[in-house]
Amino acid sequence: EGRFWNLSLLPAQWSPGAIDAPDPPVDVAAVNPWMLRMAGEVADGVHVHPLNTPTYLRETVLPNVAEGAASAGRSRSDLQLLVPCFTAVGDDGAEQERWRELARVQVAFYGSTPNYGFVFDQIGFEGTTARIRERQKAGDLAGMAAVISDDILEHFVVTATWDDLAERLAARYDGIADRVVAYFAGAAWTADPASLQRWQPVAADVRGRA
């Protein structure tokens, strides 16, 4: 039962009754300041959008989540902050470049959303979303990705060898994220199930640095 909804109309055969377990955590996905404040006020965790930069995390996410938490008598540490990250990881430059190009396409795709344009503005690339949308309206998918220059891409992607990846992730997200999600790990695993063995020590290393 809540302020707006009363979920009580449930046939007996489908009702689980009382559950002898703690309430599951409720996370909220948020991008803009209002949603981030709301998440900080009421949620157990915040799922950050994949279109994120260190600047966005520090200047938009952290202060707004903290403000929302404070309004409810809580602190930022009462919430889990889950941050996805585009990684371009490989043993050589060619492998890294393949993932960088996939990241470029994803940044352009997400960056075409008007409400997300401020993320580019924060890092000095004003008008990026408008340029992406021009190419989008023309049906030029390659042109959309081309708007994301290497200088822009650097703000969104961690490029590393497997040996360096954990250190770079820790340096980027230390003091910001409670959990880091490797955005492309699933795609890598689907293409090559053996790649999972390479992600496991990276995850263990990052956790060990927390």
Q: Which residues make up each language-model segment?
A:
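Active-site-adjacent structural elements that line small-molecule/cofactor binding pockets in enzymes
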Residues: E1-A210
